[in-house]
């Protein structure tokens, strides 16, 4: 069983990417689980017709189990598989970690609890999974959100980014976390996924960033009107229009990720290097503004 984690700046299209990769793998006959590691608990909604599912932490609170240890909960069979795992598109297993009540506790606790619970309930083996995809909150590489890479649970980490300055800045911070944790047995970087967000996106900017990081760009997802169209319907592009070119892009990306067994230790850029890339982006924006 493979375990892969996806990180990236909030709003970069990470959940869209994860859901489409999951859908592509499920269509290939793989048994797939997607674990949403974001307190907003909407990571898997496009696999379930736009419907959100109860989170693991919400279920524990509703059953009055949030103060008990996981060993006690499992030993006394106080929680069942159907309480926390829901089926989505083409049999994909969907799990949402959730977070604490607003203003209370650590938002990363849900990630720690859900991964621990899934392992102790032996669900990965019982469900005979081929691959687990962790969709992890934005650019926070601390506490529970770092668990998939910190503990080496994921075989590789993939970072979703555009050529936007803040997306690159966040991607660099994530790679800094990867390079630090890998010294203690953490996960390596599988590569960057270039998610084109608009007409000003530039491949050469991402290529320069990847070269300096020592990272591969494993795929480029073009900007497409079909993506938001599909999401309004609560679907992936794979489900919404399986014959479109963008669906094939996701299939090829899914195949690359599933077959990749290699990882690298990134060399995060210093702030001065990130600022240099930022200035190049700024010059492009100014030139574009002058045209108009």
Curated annotation (Swiss-Prot):
The keyword Transmembrane helix does not apply. Keywords: 4Fe-4S, ADP-ribosylation, ATP-binding, Iron, Iron-sulfur, Metal-binding, Nitrogen fixation, Nucleotide-binding, Oxidoreductase. GO terms for biological process: nitrogen fixation. It comes from the Archaea. Its EC number is 1.18.6.1. The key enzymatic reactions in nitrogen fixation are catalyzed by the nitrogenase complex, which has 2 components: the iron protein and the molybdenum-iron protein. NCBIfam families: nifH, PRK13230.1. Homodimer. HAMAP family: NifH (MF_00533). This is Nitrogenase iron protein 2.
């Amino acid at each position: 069983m493979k375990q892969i984690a996806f990180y990236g700046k909030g709003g970069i299209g990470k959940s869209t990417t994860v859901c489409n990769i999951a859908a592509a793998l499920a269509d290939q006959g793989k048994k797939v689980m997607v674990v949403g590691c974001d307190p907003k608990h909407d990571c898997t909604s496009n696999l379930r017709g736009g419907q959100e599912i109860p989170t693991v932490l919400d279920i524990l609170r509703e059953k009055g189990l949030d103060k008990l240890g996981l060993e006690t909960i499992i030993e006394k069979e106080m929680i069942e598989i159907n309480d926390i795992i829901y089926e989505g598109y083409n049999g994909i297993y969907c799990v949402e970690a959730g977070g604490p009540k607003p203003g209370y506790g650590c938002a990363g606790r849900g990630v720690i609890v859900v991964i621990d619970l899934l392992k102790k309930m032996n669900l990965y083996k019982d469900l005979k999974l081929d691959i687990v995809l962790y969709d992890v909150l934005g650019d926070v590489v601390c506490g529970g959100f770092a668990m998939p890479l910190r503990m080496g649970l994921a075989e590789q980490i993939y970072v979703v980014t555009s050529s936007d300055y803040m997306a690159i800045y966040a991607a660099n911070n994530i790679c800094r976390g990867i390079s630090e944790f890998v010294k203690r047995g953490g996960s390596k970087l599988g590569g960057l996924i270039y998610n084109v967000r608009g007409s000003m996106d530039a491949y050469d900017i991402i290529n320069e960033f990847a070269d300096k990081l020592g990272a591969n760009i494993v795929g480029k997802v073009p900007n497409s009107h079909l993506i938001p169209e599909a999401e309004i319907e609560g679907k992936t592009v794979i489900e919404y229009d399986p014959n479109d070119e963008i669906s094939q892009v996701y299939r090829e990306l899914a195949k690359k990720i599933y077959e990749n067994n290699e990882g690298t230790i990134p060399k995060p850029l210093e702030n001065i290097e990130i600022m240099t890339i930022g200035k190049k982006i700024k010059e492009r924006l100014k030139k574009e503004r002058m045209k108009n």
